[in-house]
Amino acid sequence: MAFENKIVEAFIEIPTGSQNKYEFDKERGIFKLDRVLYSPMFYPAEYGYLQNTLALDGDPLDILVITTNPPFPGCVIDTRVIGYLNMVDSGEEDAKLIGVPVEDPRFDEVRSIEDLPQHKLKEIAHFFERYKDLQGKRTEIGTWEGPEAAAKLIDECIARYNEQK
């Protein structure tokens, strides 16, 4: 039986091209400007999280969605998860899922990070390696993992969330 990619609902906080780091305040039901990036860089993809998950850093599991056109903050995108980037942010594991919109035919054949242009993966890794430099914070970029490992990571983060409830 062939592997089926996980389909998730990605809750988008930050659109592609933004230098603003927005965070959704769940208690108040509003978006808040967390900070403007210190570096002259911009988010290389839609950035958000998966609701009802808990990653090792204590936050919901992060996700980047590669899109044709940027959505608005608060948009939920049905996303095919194609892998993730292992990284460490300020000493904590901070995996970044990578996915593509289910409802965009331009991505119908994209099932793995290997199906993306290598340059796009380099842009994403470079962004996360450097975006906190001017804040004096350190990030370390690890390996790229495929869709099977991403599915396992999602399941672990859902289980961790359910244990914490």
From Swiss-Prot:
Lineage top rank: taxon: Bacteria
Binding site for Mg(2+) 2: D62
Pfam families: Pyrophosphatase (PF00719)
GO molecular function (one): inorganic diphosphate phosphatase activity
Residues noted as binding Mg(2+) 1 in the record, renumbered to the chain: D57, D62, D94
Subunit note: Homotrimer. In presence of divalent cations the trimers aggregate to form a hexamer.
UniProt protein name: Inorganic pyrophosphatase
